[in-house]
């Protein structure tokens, strides 16, 4: 079994306080070889001309990545040349759904934003790092169901906000504080008229349903906190309770907002201060609110993780467990970084990036479909014009206005990925290189069209393999800490099913673990990793891909600090027994 390691230009270069140079990267690659690796999987953000590191990048706070790209305009070509010198192969990790920064809460530290923001539009954001092509074509991202967008026209001020409890009994209501903002950069107390009433009212509460459907529970009596007589003209406001309130409900049924005419207001949720990606800047009054972002929200039975692919509306929230509730008028029309593969020019652009990776000297391309996009409503995205038109042509149904078969919709969306993968495979093989594909278990790709799935797409993984589009299947997210027994059992079933299918077809397999050093003693971490390596080798995998470089190696003022040295001694011994020569 070979050992590879994933290196991430983003994490290694933007997280380091020490400047990277060409010589340091060269030393890094040699160090990786010396640890016993035979391959590098390079998560890169493009060369200088692709524009991902233009000035104002929200995740390059120190400017280290931009400075490096100025001196080494094509980092991937540099990596390939240096890696090949020491006998390492290089595989470009092509993350097709991470073509922009991940969350709408990301922004520039105060006073550092450029005059012209380089990013793509998001509610409450002040710029999102993205490839230049995507910034120039923001409508090529995955699009929301049109029924959920705010109607065009002049916004009327907000007059009423209602908070609904899930029963007719609510403990005492503490003082309520309202704060408002024009820019989501600084919040100030609301100074207008305001009246707070607590009562029990009859209501038919809404239940979450993907658009355009609407569902309701049984009519009943429910406790209601009504804040009325308002005159809020600002697009952003926050509500904070000064003490415990015991207010609990599903997100769909929790809040109603009306304007001065009594019409419902379309809005986006926010529950935590925005971040500068590396650290929180403190309270939302000074930092702003991370709208439409699902991190750390204490929902009951929430699946968790940045790759959560359900919508938040169905989950139950105790308001006592969040510091405030933020409201932004309107909805994000597009997801941050997920592209709409139904557009031919999107697939062409992604193929152009494959060509760039091949021209740089890569030995293969490792295609990954996971998205880091942080969004609270995944089920209501995927309604770009070509999807709508194709569904209407195939089934005679207008999915923007009528109820529709969501399984057929997921299946259709999956066909566009199949088109891309087939073309990418043909391009890669025409250069004599290898096509790798990530197979993901958490969230699972092993879903039927009728089931919830990663990005609400049917991933027809058996077809990819049976059609011969793939050379190596890379198993990723088949382990994670803090999973329920039921989740792990489901993952294990998929593992066996996929591994057996690969065996029947004679496909090579790789395994990418999901370790994290944080919160573990080094000896426990090493023991966990070694047990996984032995299990994976016993199951017949050809590659174990350590994930990722910054977990094990850190650049410091005194050079590179290598963690888990016992692990690398074991890896070198494994290579020695396999008859592999030392690399240096």
Protein language model regions, located:
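Glycoside hydrolase catalytic-domain groove-lining segments
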Residues: 49, 380-520
């Amino acid at each position: 079994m070979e050992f590879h390691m994933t290196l991430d230009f983003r994490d290694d270069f933007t997280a380091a306080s020490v400047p990277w140079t060409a010589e340091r990267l060269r030393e890094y690659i040699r160090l990786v070889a010396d640890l016993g690796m035979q391959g590098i999987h390079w998560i890169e953000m493009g060369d200088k001309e692709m524009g991902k590191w233009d000035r104002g990048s929200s995740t390059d706070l120190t400017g280290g990545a931009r400075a490096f790209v100025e001196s080494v305009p094509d980092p991937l070509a540099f990596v390939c040349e240096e890696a090949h010198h020491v006998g390492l192969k290089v595989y470009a990790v092509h993350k097709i759904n991470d073509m922009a920064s991940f969350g709408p809460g990301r922004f520039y530290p105060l006073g550092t934003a450029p005059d012209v923001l380089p990013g793509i539009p998001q509610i409450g954001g002040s710029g999102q790092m993205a490839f230049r092509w995507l910034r120039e074509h923001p409508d090529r991202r995955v699009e929301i169901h049109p029924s959920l967008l705010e109607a065009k026209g002049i916004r009327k001020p907000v007059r009423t906000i209602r908070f609904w409890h899930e029963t007719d009994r609510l403990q005492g209501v503490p003082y309520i504080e309202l704060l408002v903002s024009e820019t989501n950069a600084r919040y100030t107390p609301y100074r207008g008229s305001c009246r707070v009433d607590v009562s029990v009212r009859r209501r038919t509460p809404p239940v979450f349903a993907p658009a355009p459907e609407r569902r309701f529970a049984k009519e009943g009596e429910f406790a209601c906190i009504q804040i009325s007589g308002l005159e809020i003209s600002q697009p952003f406001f926050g509500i904070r309770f000064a003490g415990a309130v015991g207010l609990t409900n599903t997100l769909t049924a929790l809040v109603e907002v009306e304007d001065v005419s009594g019409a419902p207001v379309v809005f986006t949720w926010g529950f935590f201060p925005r971040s500068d990606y590396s650290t929180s800047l403190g309270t939302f009054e000074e930092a702003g609110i991370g709208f439409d972002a699902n991190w750390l929200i204490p929902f009951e039975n929430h699946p968790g993780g940045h790759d959560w692919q359900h919508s938040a509306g169905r989950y139950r929230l105790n308001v006592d467990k969040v510091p405030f509730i933020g409201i932004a008028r309107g909805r994000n029309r597009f997801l941050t970084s997920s592209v709409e593969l139904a557009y031919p020019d999107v697939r062409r652009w992604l193929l152009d990036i494959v060509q760039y990776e091949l021209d740089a000297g890569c030995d293969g391309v490792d295609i990954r479909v996971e998205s880091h996009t942080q969004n609270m409503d995944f089920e209501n995205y995927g309604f770009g014009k070509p999807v709508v038109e194709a569904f209407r042509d195939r089934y005679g149904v207008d999915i923007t206005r009528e109820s529709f078969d969501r399984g057929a919709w997921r299946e259709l969306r999956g066909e566009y990925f199949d088109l891309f993968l087939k073309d990418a495979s043909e391009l890669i093989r025409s250069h004599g290189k290898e096509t790798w594909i990530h197979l993901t278990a958490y969230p699972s790709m092993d879903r039927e069209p009728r089931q919830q799935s990663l990005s609400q797409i049917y991933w027809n993984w058996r077809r990819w393999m049976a059609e011969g589009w793939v050379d190596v299947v890379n198993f990723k997210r088949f382990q994670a800490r803090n999973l329920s027994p039921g989740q792990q059992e489901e993952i294990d079933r998929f593992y066996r099913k996929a591994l057996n299918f690969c065996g029947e077809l004679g496909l090579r397999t790789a395994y990418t673990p999901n370790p994290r050093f944080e919160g573990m003693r080094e000896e426990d971490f090493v023991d966990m990793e070694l047990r996984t390596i032995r299990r994976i080798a016993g199951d017949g995998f050809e590659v174990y891909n350590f994930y990722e470089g910054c977990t094990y190696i850190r650049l410091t003022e005194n050079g590179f600090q290598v963690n888990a040295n016992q692990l690398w001694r074991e890896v070198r011994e494994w290579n020695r027994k396999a008859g592999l020569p030392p690399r240096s």
